[in-house]
Regions:
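Short, electropositive, low-hydrophobicity segments enriched in small/polar residues
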Residues: 25, 51, 55-56, 88, ...
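HotDog/MaoC-like acyl-thioester-processing domains
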Residues: 1, 85-88, 97-141
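A generic structural signal for short beta-strands and their flanking turns/coil linkers
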Residues: 18-20, 30-32, 72-78, 90-92, ...
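Hydrophobic beta-strand-centered segment that forms part of the acyl-chain substrate-binding groove
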Residues: 63-93, 98
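Non-catalytic linker/capping segments at the edges of enzyme domains
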Residues: 1-35, 39-40, 137-141
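Beta-strand residues in well-ordered beta-sheet regions across diverse protein folds
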Residues: 35-37, 95, 109
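Hydrophobic residues in beta-strands and at strand termini
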Residues: 36-38, 82, 128
Length: 141
């Protein structure tokens, strides 16, 4: 029996992302690529994809990339710049790449694209919490 890669194990347990139809396409050390189709339920009052869903896609790619090294890693912060609108039916691909890791921290950039067009640019800052993927969090004292 083989053990799932840390990014695969984390994504398999991510009900929020999987329930939106997000798919993990590829992953490797410090990188991940995910895909999501914008549904009618993801469109806001302006007729464009709600920024929260675009952020969620980018954040999920970030999570897969920063958890690819093994220890459980969480977001310490993130910023997003929306470059172009997405619409119902658009297929978005988020590619996350590690820029640097230092100590228990890291910096990751994620580009969200519709084909060749950039929809959003995301920068995430990560922090390793030091437990293995799948371990239960320690209860606070």
């Amino acid at each position: 029996m083989t053990t799932a890669h840390p990014a695969e194990a984390m994504f398999a347990a991510d009900e929020a992302s999987r329930s939106l139809g997000i798919e993990l396409l590829e992953h490797g050390p410090g990188r991940a690529e995910l895909r999501m189709t914008v549904t009618r339920a993801m469109v806001n009052g302006h007729g464009i994809a709600h920024g929260g869903y675009v952020f969620l896609l980018a954040d999920t790619a970030f999570a897969c990339a920063c958890n690819s090294h093994g220890p459980v890693t969480v977001a310490a912060g993130a910023d997003i710049t929306f470059v172009a609108p997405a619409h119902a039916g658009d297929v978005l691909v988020a590619r996350a790449e590690e820029r640097t890791r230092f100590g228990r921290s890291g910096i990751y950039d994620v580009s969200v694209r519709r084909g060749d067009e950039v929809i959003a640019e995301f920068r995430g800052r990560s922090r390793s919490v030091g437990r293995a993927t799948g371990d239960a969090p320690k209860e606070s004292q």
